Amino acid sequence: MELCEKKYVVFVNGDAMGKSIQGAGGALVLGTVFNTILTRSSISLHQNKKPEKWLEEAFLELQKIFESFDGSMYISIVLGLVEENTGLLYYINAEHPWTVLYRNGVASYIEEELTLRKIGIPENEEHLVIKNFQMLPGDTIMIGSDGRDDLLIGKEENRVINEDQNQFLKRVEEGNADLRKIYEKILKFGVILDDLSLLKVTYNPEDNKTNE
C-alpha cells in the first residue's frame, strides 16, 4: 500500500470472541471490513495520509462496526504498517497477545503493557495509542492469537493449562521464526485448546522489500 508516496506492507491478525458460529462471524466481519478499507486505500484520494492517521481511521471504522453489535461480538487484533524502505513499524494492539521480535536468533516481546481493549468495547477509542518500533535488517515480527499460549501440558494424569507466556518465545527460537516449524514445536509442547493463527513480517532491505 502507498501513503504519502511511501510504500508500506499492511498486516492484521485477529481473534474474535466466542465459539463456533459467533467466532467465525466475527472473523468474517473483520475480513470484510478490512478488505473494504484496503480497497478504498488504493484510491489516490485516500493515499495522502500519514500512517498514524491511516491506522487511526481503520481502527475507528472497525470499532464503530463491532460496537454496533451491542456487546455480542468483540475482537482482539494487531493491525500494522511497515515502511518498506526504513523498516519502521506502526501498529495498534487491541488486547491481542504481545508482539514478538525475533532478532539474531533471540525472541522477545516488544510490548510490556496493553492499554487498548478488544475492538467493540464502548469508549475504546479514548485509549487508542499508535505504537512505533524500528525494525533492523533481518528482523522478524511475529504475531499470533492466544491459541499459541492456551495449551494443555504435562502427563495425562497431571495435565494443566500453560500459564507461561514466555514459552511461546522458546517455540519461536526453536523454530527459527519459521511458521511451520513453530507450529510443530507448539504441538510437541502441548495440546492446542483454542484457535491458533500465526503471522510474521520480515524486514529485508537488501531485497528492497518486506516479506510477510
Task: Explain the meaning of each model-derived region.
Residues 1:
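Alpha-helical phosphate/pyrophosphate-handling elements in metalloenzyme active cores
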Residues 22-48, 135, 139-190, 206-212:
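Active-site-proximal, acidic helix/loop segment immediately C-terminal to a metal-coordinating Asp/Glu
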Residues 5-21, 91-95, 132-156, 200-201:
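Conserved beta-strand-loop-short alpha-helix elements that form
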Residues 16, 107-108:
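GAF sensory/regulatory domain recognition
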Residues 22-24, 89-90, 100-102, 108-112, ...:
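Extended hydrophobic-aromatic, low-complexity segments
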Residues 4, 21-105, 114, 128, ...:
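Catalytic core of PPM/PP2C metal-dependent serine/threonine phosphatase domains
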Residues 6, 77, 112-154, 189-192:
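Acidic loop->beta-strand submotif enriched in PP2C/PPM serine/threonine phosphatases
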